[in-house]
UniProtKB/Swiss-Prot annotation:
Gene3D superfamilies the record matches: Bira Bifunctional Protein, Domain 2
InterPro entries, alphabetized: aa-tRNA-synth_II, aa-tRNA-synth_II/BPL/LPL, Phe-tRNA-synth_IIc_asu, Phe-tRNA_ligase_II_N, Phe_tRNA_ligase_alpha1_bac, Phenylalanyl-tRNA_Synthase, tRNA-bd_arm
GO molecular function: ATP binding; magnesium ion binding; phenylalanine-tRNA ligase activity; tRNA binding
UniProt-listed SUPFAM superfamilies: Class II aaRS and biotin synthetases (SSF55681), tRNA-binding arm (SSF46589)
BP GO terms, sorted: phenylalanyl-tRNA aminoacylation
Catalytic activity annotation: tRNA(Phe) + L-phenylalanine + ATP = L-phenylalanyl-tRNA(Phe) + AMP + diphosphate + H(+)
Name the record gives this protein: Phenylalanine--tRNA ligase alpha subunit
Domain of life: Bacteria
EC number, UniProt record: 6.1.1.20
UniProt-annotated binding residues for Mg(2+): 254
The encoding gene: pheS
Protein species of origin: Haemophilus influenzae (strain 86-028NP)
Note on how the cofactor is bound: Binds 2 magnesium ions per tetramer.
Family the entry assigns: Belongs to the class-II aminoacyl-tRNA synthetase family. Phe-tRNA synthetase alpha subunit type 1 subfamily.
Subcellular location: Cytoplasm
């Protein structure tokens, strides 16, 4: 019996001496004591040398000692496995109190914001949006708008030509012509879209956006036009601006004017052009200028956006710099 107690203590001591709570080393001890050639297995095999009368009692004592050692080993195994699992979980633990990754949301481009702002204002006054092709014919871009053959806008250095009859439109005015050809007065339309001119510097790009307005009715007049633009500019810039109309010249309107607003620096800033639709333009689409009159407005979207948000370089709108674009979210 003393021999069995010493064997149990020896097994426990071997288990306790394992470094770093190694489960591999623990399994080696299990094999050493309880395997096919282990100490306790050998003791059970030696029972055949014991008399039949003593064998049951001796077998019970060996099993009792074996069970004590095995329970100690299994307890250590459970303890160390739990410790290993806890260490792994601690290493992989996520601190939910830390802020998570910010979900970035997209935003409208400032040019789109301006288009939406302008079209919303005029749609509430009964103007509808009309669209037209960006590859336009010489007729709709120039001839129908009373722009003669010798006009400088037709020059190669100002216009992108595909051939003598097709070009990238330089204005959305062609939409006005197409609309007047298919609709009868009264007409109230907006024509937003991309236009193209051969120019590139701090205030010009080869492609930019324009919105044009057209109103044709029997009593359309310049007084209505001035009142409409006064209201629009004050609503767009959200302040009671000083607005002035300067006489100007456009082939498709007569009389014509350019519209300025007073900037915060005390200087006048040009914002758009306008005028009464030229009688020749009305005749070109089959509308009698003696019965109907109309006015037209043309505004550069980027120009309005630059003034509203104090942007100094128009090219910034097309560089996709998130540091710039995030300011408008």
């Amino acid at each position: 019996m003393q021999h069995l107690n010493e064997l149990v203590e020896k097994a426990k001591l071997a288990i306790e001496s394992i470094q770093d709570k190694s489960l591999t080393a623990l399994d080696e001890i299990r094999v050493e004591y309880f395997g096919k050639k282990g100490y306790f297995t050998q003791l059970m095999q030696e029972l055949r040398n014991v008399s039949a009368e003593e064998r049951p009692a001796m077998g019970a004592k060996i099993n009792e000692a074996k069970q004590a050692a095995l329970e100690f080993l299994n307890a250590k195994k459970t303890e160390w496995e739990q410790a290993e699992l806890n260490a792994k979980l601690e290493k992989e633990r996520v601190d939910v109190s830390l802020p998570g990754r910010k979900v970035e949301t997209g935003g409208l481009h400032p040019v789109t914001m301006t288009i939406n702002r302008v079209t919303k204002f005029f749609s509430e006054l009964g103007f509808s949006v009309e669209n037209g092709p960006e590859i336009e014919s010489d007729y709709y871009n120039f001839d129908a708008l009373n722009i003669p053959k010798h006009h400088p806008a037709r020059a190669d250095h100002d216009t992108f030509w595909f051939n003598p009859e097709l070009l990238l439109r330089t204005q959305t005015s062609g939409v006005q012509i197409r609309t007047m050809e298919k609709m009868q007065p009264p007409i109230r339309i907006m024509a937003p879209g991309r236009v193209y001119r051969n120019d590139y510097d701090q205030t010009h790009t080869p492609m930019f956006h324009q919105i044009e307005l057209l109103y044709v009715d029997k009593k359309a007049n310049f007084t209505e036009l001035k009142g409409l633009l006064h209201d629009f500019l004050r609503a767009f810039f959200e302040e009671d601006l000083q607005v002035r109309f300067r006489p100007s010249y456009f082939p498709f309107t007569e009389p014509s004017a350019e519209v300025d607003v007073m900037g915060k620096n005390g200087k006048w800033l040009e914002v758009l052009g306008c005028g009464m639709v030229h009688p020749n333009v009305l005749r070109n689409v089959g509308i009698d200028p003696n019965e109907y009159s109309g006015f037209a407005v043309g505004m550069g979207v980027e120009r309005l956006t630059m003034l509203r948000y104090n942007v100094t370089d128009l090219r910034s709108f097309f560089e996709n710099d998130l540091r710039f674009l995030k300011q408008f979210k």
